[in-house]
Amino acid sequence: WYKIGEGSESVLESRWYEGEPIWVTAEKQGKVSATYFWPGSEAEINGKRPTYWYVFDASTSNETIIDQLLAWLDLPEGERPVFMTAYFNDANYWGHTLGPEAEGMDTVIQGLDLDLGRLIAGLTARDLLDKVNIIVTADHGMVEIDRDRMIFLDDYIDLEDVTMAGWSPVAGIIPNEGLEDSIYNSLVNVHPQLSVYKKEETPEHLHYRNHRRITPIIGIADEGWSISTRDYYNSNPEAYIGGTHGYDPDFLSMHGIFLAYGPAFKDGLIVPSF
């Protein structure tokens, strides 16, 4: 199975990555690229890696990351990256831990704003601010969850009859041989906050039908609801508190920011969500 996160061995396996990351495109063109934490950047993809890259370490400070970005820009031409990525974990970690509406999240966002200011100041000092293109974005939103909004699959099916490839808020369900219709019929329409689909019937806007790794049955919780088992729920009193993501992307809570600045972008332009 693939599992993202610190210490995961699967993130090093190129077989999981079928798209072409931008840094691979750059390297194919003979350009220098650099990544400071980004999904896929620890693996060799299509025979390529970034010129400079780091193994994910959640304890790395944002100041360390930003200072390395600036140090890369100080390298001589030919060694200096023309494409760089950096990932900051604060909003995700604390969003999961506290929940996105928690008072402490204001402090987290203020800290990230200061970190961005550190980068801008470094670019300004190097007379690069108006010569580089900067994109600030997020991979997902976040919504509050709590232990009162639960869907227990074992109320409806025998978990010995399935393999679970994911739990919440999207349950990836692989029925044992010959049981697909039975499992589907046992789950569809049994809970008002759970939508259940066969792979080929998922909503078009999810773009989640055709890949071979998509499970035969998919259960999707409504916004703010969680999918679990009663045993796991009862054994883990700290679970399902705080925030999470992965719900239908039509929910505004799942939207992320996308800000861009630099010579390649129109000043003041606002575009529709995408």
Show where each model-derived region lies.
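Second-shell loop/turn segments in exported
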Residues: S8-E13, W23, V55-D57, E103-I109, ...
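Acidic, His- and aromatic-enriched active-site or binding-groove loops in soluble protein domains
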Residues: T51-L75, F83, M105-L114, D154-V170
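Structural motif
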Residues: F83-Y87, I135, L259
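Active-site neighborhoods of enzymes that stabilize oxyanions during catalysis
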Residues: A165-F274
